[in-house]
A protein has these predicted regions:
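Double-stranded beta-helix
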Residues: 9, 162-221
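Short, conserved beta-strand element in jelly-roll/cupin
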Residues: 137, 141-164, 205-208, 213, ...
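Short, surface-exposed loop/helix-turn segments at secondary-structure junctions
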Residues: 60-63, 131-138, 186-198, 229, ...
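A short secondary-structure junction signal
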Residues: 124-125, 129-132, 136, 146-147, ...
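Short edge-strand/loop segments of extracellular domains
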Residues: 120-123, 172-179, 232, 238-244
């Protein structure tokens, strides 16, 4: 779904715009089935190893992960995009409904950045670790400086309704024109406290099917999931104009849309998966620091 002129202007003025109704259940269903199948496999492995006692096969997608997580935090190991490398995920990265909106901001030639994640945020009461609450940061802080010279567009996409109770994001608008704020490491890469904007945060609630579009300079953080068993499932994907740096050059980006040169578009899932396998092996041999601090 293409964005309206008003929505595009809101993004460029404030560094963020939330648009409901971009994606449909039909867009999500294949990927959710893949993630559910992963949970099936991973839970069975953990049970065979004695790590859990109950598979909770009667629980729905919204809550099952949390029930298993309550027995073992290992349920999520291997769940991220670069680990799964599933065809359904590859197809979603090239989803036309999403790319129509992305094109409204980036133009007709688009690459998918390798900075992309599946996130399963279980209820905070199940684990006291602050690692499940990402601190205030800009996406520019988790990429190399090369990406500062172009617009890197983050698409934050909930797979279930993201509410305050379920731990939706908080963000600070109107920082897009300030640019990169100095970050520091420790407790998760975060904006230096003395560099934090004075503007108050806004809760970024969004329904399944909606997308939050963020500039790489818009500060945001996650908040505690205060529900009993609901998991806040979400994706964060990033796109850049074709040929522009992603800020993580040692991992593979690829062309997802090109009006001028459609032959550039990568449609081969196996090739995409191979690019990731090769890049991860090279990263194992010659580690590169992903964040700029």
């Amino acid at each position: 779904m293409a964005l309206t002129e008003a929505q595009v202007n809101e993004f460029h003025e404030h560094g963020v715009v939330t648009v409901e109704g971009i994606l449909t259940d039909e867009d999500f269903d294949p990927m959710i089935e893949t993630m559910s199948a992963f949970i099936d496999r991973r839970a069975q492995v953990l049970k065979d190893e004695g790590g859990i006692t109950d598979l909770y096969e009667d629980k729905p997608f919204l809550t099952r992960y949390a029930h298993i997580f309550n027995q073992s935090e290992e349920i999520g190991r291997g769940l991220d995009i670069f680990e799964l490398r599933a065809k359904t995920v590859f197809d979603f990265l090239r989803n036309d409904h999403l790319l129509d909106a992305v094109e409204s901001i980036l133009g007709p030639d688009i690459s998918c950045s390798p900075i992309q994640h599946i996130r399963a945020k279980p209820p905070s009461r199940l684990n006291g670790s602050p690692g499940f609450n990402v601190p205030w940061h800009q996406d520019s802080g988790v990429s190399w400086e090369e990406s500062d010279r172009t617009l890197s567009l983050t698409c934050w996409i909930p797979l279930v309704d993201a509410t305050v109770k379920r731990g939706c994001m908080e963000m600070i608008p109107d920082v897009i024109h300030t640019g990169h704020l100095e970050h520091e490491a420790g407790g998760g890469t975060h904006i230096r406290p003395d560099m934090m904007p004075d503007t108050g945060p806004v809760a970024a609630e969004v329904k399944k099917g909606g997308v939050i579009f963020l500039s790489q300079y818009t500060p945001h953080r996650s908040t505690p999931n205060l529900s009993d068993w609901d998991v806040r499932w979400s994706l964060d994907l990033r796109y850049v104009a074709y040929g522009e740096p992603t800020g993580r050059p040692f991992f593979p980006d690829f062309c997802v849309r090109s009006r001028s040169h459609p032959e550039r578009v990568l449609t081969d899932h196996e090739e995409w998966a191979r690019l990731w396998v090769d890049a991860l092996e090279e990263q194992r041999r010659n580690p590169q620091h992903a964040h700029r601090v």
